[in-house]
UniProtKB/Swiss-Prot annotation:
Residue ranges of domain J in the record: 26-93
The name this protein goes by in its record: DnaJ-like protein 60
UniProt xrefs under SUPFAM superfamilies: Chaperone J-domain (SSF46565)
Keyword Transmembrane appears in the UniProt entry: yes
Organism lineage: Eukaryota, Metazoa, Ecdysozoa, Arthropoda, Hexapoda
InterPro entries reported for this sequence: DnaJ_C4, DnaJ_domain, J_dom_sf
Signal sequence annotation: none
Tissue expr: Highly expressed in testis and ejaculatory bulb.
UniProt keyword Transmembrane, yes or no: yes
Gene: DnaJ-60
Main subcellular location: membrane
Topological relation to the membrane, as annotated: Single-pass membrane protein
GO biological process: cell differentiation; protein refolding; response to heat; spermatogenesis
Amino acid sequence: MLRLCLPTRAGYVRNFSNDKPRKPETHYEVLNIRNDCSTREVRNAFVQLSKLYHPDVKSNAACPERTARFVQISEAYKTLIKPERRRDYDDSLLWQPSRSDRSPVGETVNPGQAWDVRPNYDPNPGPYYGIRGLKRVSNWQVAVVLMALGFVGALFGFTSVRSSFKLSRQIQDEISAEANSHHAAVVADAQKYGNEEQVRRMVDRMSRSPFNQSSAK
């Protein structure tokens, strides 16, 4: 029996190790800024790049590549200039594929490494979003500050209620003292001049009352 052995056709085996697709740029890379840059830095970067790639510039009018680049710059600016859209975009950067879904021929791929998890934070973070002088604080520091504010608020409320109660009681004591003084004066006049004199004075005051005078007319 004859046994045919076909040679390996190595010429038809292509190695795609050098044909990896180019990784798309992030908005930060398009504007050439840091991930923790401030809103002002985003605006300044957009202004500078617009001067270079804006379609109204004569040198860019006949260059489709520069026009397409300006579209990328505008999209990056619209996303990063608004805090809410920027936070959503930063969250989307947490998960990114490290390579194409297609496994190149001749390249060993570990299924467990199909995706590269890249946390979107710096191990040594600087100021939050580039705000100068504002440092990041830990959760326990925030909790301590909130507890201190709560204690100060409770103390202020207790002091306010206590002061209000003391003031109200002081006013009541003054009114009571004035009433007692008037009552004592009336009793003293009654003892000094007698009841008949008190009645005559009361009738005299009533006769001088404007209400009684208008009624008499």
